A protein has these predicted regions:
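Hydrophobic beta-strand-centered segment that forms part of the acyl-chain substrate-binding groove
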Residues: 39-84, 89-90, 104
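Conserved beta-strand segments that form the floor/walls of ligand-binding pockets within enzyme
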Residues: 10, 23, 65, 77, ...
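Hot-dog-fold acyl-thioester-processing enzymes
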Residues: 1-60, 114-134
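HotDog/MaoC-like acyl-thioester-processing domains
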Residues: 3-7, 71-72, 83-134
């Protein structure tokens, strides 16, 4: 079992589409912002640490179910947790929660650790697996 972490984000005017709510593509921006924040703040492994070691994370796939719209000036909570770690991939589940606590969107992403020079997948070092196993 892995811990769940949360990051709060305030919806900006630039996030709003012509329907008056957050555009669907912005949900991915929120997820990215939250993951980078949580890697540094919660896991104590900032993304820059991966870059220094010659690694990077690439998104293999993301699945999102949109349930409720988000609106300007709403403070949302992005909750994420590691669901599964395999040899070269990490499955991260997420929820975007409205002010009310109701789920606005949910889903998961699969990330692949890659060698920054070759662009090829590499095995996740045991030290990283240990950091994520909190």
């Amino acid at each position: 079992m892995y811990s769940k972490f949360e990051t709060e984000i305030v919806v900006r005017p630039s996030d709003i589409d012509y329907n008056g709510h957050v555009h669907q593509s912005v949900y991915l921006d929120y997820l990215l912002f939250a993951r980078v924040d949580q890697m540094k703040r919660c896991y104590k492994v900032p993304i820059e640490e991966f870059f220094k070691r010659g690694f990077s994370w690439a998104t293999k796939s993301t699945t999102i179910e949109y349930k409720r719209p988000l609106f300007m000036d709403e403070t949302i909570t992005v909750r994420t947790w590691v669901k599964e770690i395999k040899k070269m991939t990490v499955k991260v589940c997420f929820q975007l929660l409205k002010d009310s606590g109701k789920i606005a969107a949910q889903g998961h992403s699969i990330y692949v650790l890659i060698n920054s020079k070759t662009g090829k997948p590499v095995a996740i070092p045991e030290a990283i697996i240990e950091k994520y196993s909190i």
